[in-house]
Amino acid sequence: MLEGLKIKYGVIFNHKKVARIMKKYNLKPEYIRRIRPNYSAKTIAENVQPNLVKRQFKTKGLNQIWCTDITYLIFGNKRAYLSTIIDLYDRHVVAYQISKRNDIKLVIDTLNKALEKEKDVYGLILHSDQGFQYTSNEYKVICASKGISISMSRKGTPIDDSPMESWHGILKKETLYNNNITSLGHYIQLVEEWVAFYNSTRLKNRNLN
């Protein structure tokens, strides 16, 4: 487990701490696979967490509630996936990651980016849907090690994560649908520019209003 976290995600934890976390959440180690894990319905059900947010999308400060989700990106005959984390306090983008694969690594890389930027996250609620990435042992171990509480939308209820759904819709409208994208690298550049504009300019203007 330790070696798998280190190799795949660049995360290093003391083995005793990981053992305590896994015991607390009744987690069992998994083999690293090169394909998408085929979690059983029982495993997913055991790892699903309650909805702590309950559509209360307003907070009193930063790093109280983050929302996260994955959306697909289609341009030409190509497909990619965007994983994003936003802070519900002011809706700024904490971190994002684009990949050709919709896998656990995509979510873990996004989370690690966010944790590199924001160190004071103890007590934070991280809300998502019930996707296999968010019910994975790797995701639960990292969140638990940082004192982050996992919250999940009810199955088949995207409105429970509507701020994230809305943000992805806006990004697609203003990047994916308005440009002649020729490659994944081209699209990543567009997203980088748009997120920088969104965080620095659009949010500032919105908050002034």
Question: Where do the protein language model's features map onto the residues?
Answer:
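Mobile genetic element proteins and their domesticated derivatives, centered on retroelements
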Residues: M1, V18, M22, V53, ...
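Basic, flexible linker segments flanking DNA-binding modules
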Residues: M1-G61, T157
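RNase H-like two-metal-ion nuclease catalytic core shared by retroviral integrases
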Residues: Y39-K42, S128-Q130, S136-N137, I150-K172, ...
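An active-site-proximal beta-strand-loop segment
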Residues: T59-V94, K100-R101
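Active-site beta-loop-alpha junctions of metal-dependent nucleic acid enzymes
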Residues: K78, Q97-K119, I125, T135
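Short small-residue beta-strand/loop micro-motif enriched in glycine and branched aliphatics
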Residues: D90-Y96, S151-S153, Y177-N178
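Short, polar/flexible loop-turn hinges at active-site or ligand-entry regions and domain interfaces
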Residues: L176-L184
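Charged, gly/pro-enriched flexible loop segments at helix/strand junctions
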Residues: V195-N209
